[in-house]
Amino acid sequence: MAKERVLDLRRPVTVWRSQDLQDGRSAESLTMILRTVGCRWNRCTMCGYAGEGAPASALDLIAQFECAMERSSTDVSVVKIYTSGSFLDPAEMPVQARDEILKRLKALGIKKLVIETRPEYVTPQTVEICQTCLPTEFAIGLETASDLIRENAIKKGFTFQDFVNASETVHRQGGRVKAYLLLKPPLLTEGQAMRDAIASARAARDHADILSLNLCNVQRNTMVERMWERGEFRPPWLWSALEVLKSVPGPIVCDPVGAGTRRGPHNCGECDDAVAEAIRTHALSQDVAPLQSLDCQCKSTWTELMELEEQSFGNIV
């Protein structure tokens, strides 16, 4: 009989140090994923994070934050706090924990905080609370500018106008907005997904300070995983990500999580590491020149596949 997994509610899911783009330059950042009760919406077709939820109290979350900050140093100027849901949702991040975390970050002199939230939790009050403590970047999972795709393929539960309204609320109080865009939602062909990502990036540009291109990967216990197991979904080609990055004016960043694996974005296996590394380098430099020179024999396969899909399914996006 399998042992039941015991979760330590006073330790974060994970924490790591990395480089982050800040004011056009590379900066040392600390990223933590806190274990909360999980996303209240919990219906997105590609998201498996809800399975990581647990009944963490405000004191548990403060302890998780303290544990994560042990990895920090004076070099860290950016702190990113992710909850697999919405930092601004009081049902997920109790006000007591939120306010204590903000107070401590302010005392440490952190230059920028990045949090994730759905647009319905972005209010003048919640933005002011964050901005009063330290400059905050509010990351919103827009995924696509198409309401049709967002509702039917992703089941996100809000509209493009909801995103615009939240963005305006943030900007009125001097905050920054990051828009997450999803490359290859389920039900779209490779070419459709690539064109939608480019169109979405251009539409979101007027409302976001920075764009983040997220390459769809296959997470467990999701609709996307069930489609993938039936052979109905393939994660995006890394070539498609390159085309989006080359086609959209910056700043736009991308971290190809799971690149080169069956469940993650991949090409043929031979060029995956080189292309993924070029994408990560571009996130810090915003220089598209290195992306132009990448090549592999599988690139023609990618092109032919998209042409075949267009002949089979047509151009609907």
Predicted regions and their residues:
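Core AdoMet radical
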Residues: Y49-M93, L105-V122, P135-F163, I210-S212
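Distinct, well-ordered alpha-helical segments
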Residues: A91-D99, T123-Q131, G191
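Active-site-proximal loop/turn and secondary-structure-junction residues that shape catalytic pockets
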Residues: G85-F87, P119-Y121, T144-S146, L183-L187, ...
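Auxiliary Fe-S-binding modules of radical SAM enzymes
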Residues: A2-Q22, C216-V317
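Conserved C-terminal portion of the radical SAM core fold
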Residues: Q161-T222, S240-P256
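Acidic (Asp/Glu)-rich catalytic clusters
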Residues: M69-T74, L102-L108, E128-P135, E168-Q173, ...
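Structural recognition of alpha->loop->beta junctions
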Residues: C133-T136, M194-S212, D273-L294
